[in-house]
Amino acid sequence: MALSKKPTTGMKDILPEEMQIRDYVISVIKDTYGKFGFTSIETPCVENIANLSSKQGGDNEKLIFKILKRGEKLNVAAATTEEEVVDSGLRYDLTVPLVRYYSNNAASLPSPFKALQMGNVWRADRPQRGRYRQFMQCDIDILGEPSNLAEIELILATTTTLGK
């Protein structure tokens, strides 16, 4: 079988020129948010399917690229439900992984905790013109700060970053 030269529908190759621009923008974002006290974190791109799936269903359920179980855990022929063959999925945004990360590590983190995340996310929806199934997302959050001043700080940090 011949090699398909085009990426899968909804995916994109990034050429060196665009990668240089992307790297520069990422460095400006990290530098600016860092001056506001945001700390970079990284979470796995694969999350437990139970964390990604909401109990109410909804639109997010349709966004998940589901990953089949492997090895002894996978028995497709005997499976009667999706849960029997799927145990994880690719993250569709950075919020769910952040919640899991914070709940697992809160005792080791400062309070309030200012998180900066940048990473690829995947959405299993039908790509429309100019949209992709894989793209980079940037997210800042302040956890453990009950006042509305945190919201103002998020806005100030973002407008400062976008102004550069």
Residue ranges and their predicted role:
Residues 1-164:
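TRNA-recognition modules of translation machinery and tRNA-sensing kinases, especially anticodon-binding
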